[in-house]
């Protein structure tokens, strides 16, 4: 009987500890990434995929505004989970003889083969 009680108490303690650990990790994750919030891009912001999105943003802006911007580099990349992913990119581009920073928002829904430039403007900083 004593052995049975020992095992029941041990199992209850282990379960309680496991639950506490899971809740602690859950709260930690909530603090670092709020659903729908903009956060720094995980991984390499200069990956081929992100560079491709930056080049797409410049290409679309050039078409829409009849401009000739030339991509130089990605300065900063952030993402936001929406119905898909909204990429917030700060990029450097050459306009004539000047190099300037621009901010672009590109909305991507990979399961629909959808990519759209939502915003493109010269950076104030």
From Swiss-Prot:
Q: Where does the entry annotate site (Reactive site)?
A: 36
What subcellular compartments does it reside in? Secreted
Sequence motif Secondary area of contact, location on chain: 80-84
Q: Where is the Cystatin domain?
A: 36-124
Q: Which GO terms describe its biological process?
A: defense response; hyperosmotic response; response to cold; response to oxidative stress; response to water deprivation
Q: Which UniProt keywords apply?
A: Plant defense, Protease inhibitor, Secreted, Signal, Thiol protease inhibitor
The stretch of residues making up the signal peptide is 1-22
The record ties this protein, via InterPro entries, to: Cystatin (IPR027214), Cystatin_dom (IPR000010), Cystatin_sf (IPR046350), Prot_inh_cystat_CS (IPR018073)
Kindly report the protein's main subcellular placement as a broad class.
secreted
Single GO MF descriptor: cysteine-type endopeptidase inhibitor activity
Q: Which family does the record assign?
A: Belongs to the cystatin family. Phytocystatin subfamily.
Q: What does this protein do?
A: Specific inhibitor of cysteine proteinases. Probably involved in the regulation of endogenous processes and in defense against pests and pathogens.
Q: What is this protein called?
A: Cysteine proteinase inhibitor 3
**Species of provenance:** Arabidopsis thaliana
The primary gene name is CYS3
């Amino acid at each position: 009987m004593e052995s049975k009680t020992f095992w029941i108490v041990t199992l209850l303690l282990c379960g309680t500890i496991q639950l506490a650990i899971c809740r602690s990790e859950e709260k930690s994750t909530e603090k670092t990434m709020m659903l729908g919030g903009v956060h720094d891009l995980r991984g390499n912001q200069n990956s081929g995929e992100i560079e491709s999105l930056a080049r797409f943003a410049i290409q679309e802006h050039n078409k829409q505004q009849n401009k000739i911007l030339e991509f130089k580099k990605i300065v900063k990349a952030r993402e936001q989970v929406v119905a898909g992913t909204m990429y917030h990119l700060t990029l450097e581009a050459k306009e004539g003889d000047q190099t300037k920073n621009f901010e672009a928002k590109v909305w991507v829904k990979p399961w629909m083969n959808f990519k759209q430039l939502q915003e493109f403007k010269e950076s104030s900083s």
